[in-house]
Amino acid sequence: MQIFKGDFSATKGIPPSGLCVGVHRAGAIHQKMVAKHGDHLAVWSLRPDLDFIAFKKEGLGEQGIRSTSEMESINASSEKLIYGVRGAPPEIREKAREKGLTLLADATCPFVTQQEEAELQLLESGCHLVVLSSRTHHGIPRLQGIAREKGKEVFIVEREEDVEGIRLTRFEPIGVIVQTTFWLETYKKIMARILERFANVQIRNTACIDSLQRLPEVEKLAKQVDAIIIFGWTEGMTNRMLEVARAFNAHVHKIEKVDDLQLDWLRGKGKVGIIGANETPDWMINEAIERIKSMAA
C-alpha cells in the first residue's frame, strides 16, 4: 500500500504541515510569551480542548500556560492573559478589562480579524448580512447578536438552494461575507445566484489564503488515491475538506484521533491519502501514517 500525505504551506517561511497560517502564528506567540514571561499564563479560547492537544505535545502545559473558555476562572492577581487564535468577542474583552487582567498578547488570526471588521463595516453602512458559512460555525451567534442591535438580519448560506431563503426584496442592501474556510467553487456558484436575485450587493471575500490553497490540495489528493482520510474536528475547515473530497472520491473518511482509524477502510486500497485540517499538528498526522502502515502490514 502507498500512503500519500497532503503537504503544503500557504505562506513562505512556514514549513509544510497540518497547521494553518493563523494557528502556526498563534503557537509561535504562545512559545514567545512563555519564554519571556514564564508561568501563570492563561489563553482565553473558544476551543480550549484543541489548544490542549497542541500544548500537551509542545510541553507548554508543563511550563505554566493553560487554555480556558471561562473568563471567570482567570485570576487577575496571579495570571496574565492571551487571546487565542479564534479571537475573543467584545463582551469577553470587556470582562477582562473589568477584572483588571493584564493582556500580554492577542493571537487572533489576522483573517478572523479581517472578517470581523468587514462584518461591522457592512452593518454600519446599513446592509443586512448574507454569510457564506456552515450554520454551526462558532462565530454565528455573536454576529447575529450584533446585527440585531443594529436592526439588521443575518442569513446563513451553505449551498446554492439556501439563497431562496433570503427574505429580502431585490433592492434592499445586502452585504456578503465569506467565512474564512469556505470553498471557492461553492462560493462562485452561490454568488452567481445571489447576484441574479439581488441588485444592491456589497461583497467582502474574507476567505483566508490557507483555505484557498488547502482545499485544492484536498481535491488533488482525492483524485490520485483510492481512499482519503481527513484528520480534523467538526468545524468549518474539516467540513469544507470533507465536502471537497467527496466530490472527487467515493471513499472518504474522517478521524479526530489516531484510534478512529479502521482496518476496513484500508482493505483493497492500493493508494491511501491523508491530510490534516487547519488545527491538526503535523506530529498527529505522522502518528496516523505510522498506524496505517502497521494496520496494513
Task: Give the label of every model feature segment.
Residues 1-297:
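The feature marks the mature, well-folded catalytic cores of soluble enzymes
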